[in-house]
Amino acid sequence: CSRICPYDAINNIYEDKSRMYAGSFRNGRMVYGRLAPGEENSGKLVNMVRQEAKREAENNQLAVTIIDGPPGIGCPVISAITGVDHVIIVTEPSVSGLHDLKRTIEITSKFNLKSWVIINKSDINSNISELIKTYCKNTRIDILAELPFDSQMVEAMVQCKSIIEWLPDSTISQKLIHAFNRITNGS
């Protein structure tokens, strides 16, 4: 409308609504970004969040910083893994999940990053789960955990808790604790 209105009665106003936030939560500090729908520069926002998280970690003498990167394989993923020591790739057994996993492993290999894989909802498609495991074996990527679908994960989120807080003795909680211990021990 703004391009064809003969009276210039309509103007587009471009405003970047993407924001970075930092604050405390029940387990420590968190830095995160919120990208408004349709906004560009998501890689730039991820970089800003990563840099602020690094400052927070240094200021609070934290040895481990976890960056939860975006899904997919675009620029925001590259921005999220830049300067990290390790990458945990969480995938699901779907055609697109397998495709993105392969591309992400290619990227992490180019950066010479130690990578692990977690297969989320590993039981929803056993054929693709097997393809994921075979691909990881062939590329020498360790699978940290295979997490089956569990409706208790949803219930934990409804209760605003992690699954480990909600059901600490559940199979998924135990698998996640084991994965965390492997990561922090570097094995």
Label for each model-derived stretch:
Residues 12-41, 45-48:
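FAD-binding core/adjacent interface of flavoenzyme oxidoreductases
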Residues 67, 89, 117-119:
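Structural beta-sheet core signal
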Residues 56, 101, 117:
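Residues forming the flavin
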Residues 107-187:
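C-terminal lobe/tail of nucleotide-utilizing enzymes
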Residues 34-37, 41, 48-77:
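Switch II (G3) loop of P-loop NTPases
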Residues 68-74, 94-102:
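A general structural motif
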